[in-house]
Amino acid sequence: MADTEPSPLFVFSTIAIIISTFVIFYFVQQSKKNTPVLKPDTFQKFPLIEKTRVSHNSSVYRFGLPKSTDRLGLPIGQHISIGATIGGKEVVRSYTPISTDDELGYFDLLIKTYENGNISKHVDSKKVGEYVEIRGPKGFFTYTPNMVKSFGMIAGGTGIAPMYQIITAILRNPADKTKISLIYANVTESDILLKSELDKWAEEHPDNFSVHYVLNEAPENWKGSVGFVTPEIIDSKLPKASDDSNLLLCGPPPMISAMKKAAVGLGFAKAKPVSKLGDQVFVF
């Protein structure tokens, strides 16, 4: 019997099937990567994989995700909740990671340990390899590139965390032209968290980012401001109130109360009891 060559239609169909199978396999594999891990209503256990002390009472805690290709799944500007049973009671506190979803396989939390802080002491007591229970995301602020022309930010202490996350997202995106002006208040110079990173950003992105430090107790030859954040400092260091400029606040309650009052005096809208996306003044 003479050999017969396969018909062109058969060859084409076979190639099409092979290509289709490969494409389907590729997208299935891709869908398994970069999987968001967080669940808003369910606490999940995440292992502590690294702890870095950044001041006498604050540390950056790095927690691992199930796979090295996983992402936390937290929109920029939102936060997570840490839960624990302490003294027979369920205690929950919210924190904003300083990492973004660009980091795969882990996320970082900046936490200050307070003497009476149940959750902060609970986290600080953990050793590498031990677990913390976390759920999320939560919050009413979700950052999108170029959502405003400029952000004025006022942070106190660990209130730098949500600001740091937003700044990171903006400066990493060449297409994002948002300008950021930050006032960061602390008690002493040693209390300034992430200072080297902030100073580096200010040096590398002078057209998009500036930072001004305020200390209650300043050393000699201090180049920042001394005392409290005043309306005069806000007026000179942050963008003026406008439709294209938002003011973001995060810090101790007494400070935030004073900042909201100062903002109104400078022409900003009065901050609402619960801030929502789109508010001219947003309190984390």
Curated annotation (Swiss-Prot):
List of residues binding FAD: 124-139, 150-182
Lipoprotein keyword on record: no
Every FAD-binding FR-type domain range: 41-144
UniProt subcellular location: Mitochondrion outer membrane
GO biological process assignments: protein histidyl modification to diphthamide; tRNA wobble base 5-methoxycarbonylmethyl-2-thiouridinylation
Keyword ATP-binding among record annotations: no
Pathway where it operates: Protein modification; peptidyl-diphthamide biosynthesis
PANTHER family attached to this UniProt entry: NADH-CYTOCHROME B5 REDUCTASE, NADH-CYTOCHROME B5 REDUCTASE-LIKE
Function comment: NADH-dependent reductase for DPH3 and cytochrome b5. Required for the first step of diphthamide biosynthesis, a post-translational modification of histidine which occurs in elongation factor 2. DPH1 and DPH2 transfer a 3-amino-3-carboxypropyl (ACP) group from S-adenosyl-L-methionine (SAM) to a histidine residue, the reaction is assisted by a reduction system comprising DPH3 and a NADH-dependent reductase, predominantly CBR1. By reducing DPH3, also involved in the formation of the tRNA wobble base modification mcm5s 2U (5-methoxycarbonylmethyl-2-thiouridine), mediated by the elongator complex.
Assigned protein family: Belongs to the flavoprotein pyridine nucleotide cytochrome reductase family.
Assembly information from the UniProt record: Monomer. Component of the 2-(3-amino-3-carboxypropyl)histidine synthase complex composed of DPH1, DPH2, DPH3 and a NADH-dependent reductase, predominantly CBR1.
Protein's UniProt name: NADH-cytochrome b5 reductase 1
Organism name: Scheffersomyces stipitis (strain ATCC 58785 / CBS 6054 / NBRC 10063 / NRRL Y-11545) (Yeast)
Lineage: Eukaryota, Fungi, Dikarya, Ascomycota, Saccharomycotina
